[in-house]
Amino acid sequence: MKIKQFLFAFAMILLVIGVNSCKKNDETVKEEFENTFQISADQAVTNNLSQDAEDVFLEIAQDYSIAGNFAPEPVNNIIPCATVTITPATGFPKTILIDFGTSCVHRGVTRSGKINITLTDSVRKSGSIAIMTFTNYFVNMYKVEGTYTWTNTSTANTRSWIRLTAGGRITAPDARVWTHEGNRTVTQTAGVGTISVLDDVFSVFPGTHTVTNSSNISRTCTILEALQRKVDCSNIDKGKVKVQGPNHYATVDFGDGTCDNLATLSIDGRAPRTIVLR
């Protein structure tokens, strides 16, 4: 009888340990899922902000006739609320300062602060390098920091760049902070033969990025389907990114080409959630 009682008690102990272990494991999995969800949403915002910085750079380069490929045109102040200073007036390398002041609203996007760029040669010339940094720079209340380096890899038939991000840091309007670094290949797919930048369309593929939150939890992000960014749209409107978790993954879907500020996020094929890009 004592042996039976002992075995029963021992079995109950194992059952309790097993239940508690499962509960802790479920809580851990749930926490990891939430970390992946938030980091995935953050990387989607990061993609948009990085592409936005590139759009501003290319618009200014075209407006001030330092893009190359076309004869010089009169300055049109394409971003009228920004003050642009380029030195020296002739020759390369050049230093470009884009000052948005305290509030510059252009095509529905509010910017403030400064973008600093050093440029080795005409933007569209193969081999040219542009290095961008930021001074107290905000886009729709997101603070953008880090160093972005563009290296022109264009050929006779293709206009493209490799974009490297080092020391990237984003502070959201709710004070959350995350860092990011990685590289992307950007190819222009429309508007190559026109002076206007408004018909330009860019495809971002391939590329990998690492995003780390304030708790030092990281996720690796890989482009599955090319991200599409039209200059006349404020957000990426097409493409997919895979975000790898410890034992799961998330897929961020930017849509079918419709211009809006939404994307969907699904973890391990579960029902997707909608996220706001910025």
What role is predicted for each listed range?
Residues 1-8:
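Bacterial N-terminal signal peptides that target proteins for export
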Residues 17-21:
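C-terminal motif of bacterial Sec signal peptides marking the signal peptidase cleavage site
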Residues 24-278:
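Low-complexity, intrinsically disordered segments exposed to solvent
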